[in-house]
Amino acid sequence: MLDAPSAPAAGLQIETGSPVIRLTRLRLLDGAPMLAEEIWLPYDRFAPLATLELDAFGDLLYPLYESHCGQIIASAEETLTAEAVNATYARLLRIQPGDPVMVIERVARGYDRVPLEWRRSRGAAAHFRYHVDIR
């Protein structure tokens, strides 16, 4: 359990300093890092995850949220931006500090529209592809 920094708190619509759970993941494709993720969850809704063994976490988190915490993600909104990567994320993504990365910020909500998850994912811009189907 951590105190929520300002950006995750704003995304989750909770007070800065409120108790949260922070998950970090490195998403791989054929052994190469594609995305470095930080995921923030309000502690009061996701407390069972704080004591869960690491091997219980799979690739898909939303089914885990439902089965262990009773929280169902109904929708999500994403914002894409670009930035120069810092040394920490450069090391994780195996790129050089200052290289461009795409940043995806996601707010996932329950059926009641209350934010349940705030996520920030970073991936090397060289590997990034965006596709949208507009009808």
Model-derived regions, located:
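All-alpha effector-binding/dimerization core of bacterial HTH-type transcriptional repressors
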Residues: M1-R135
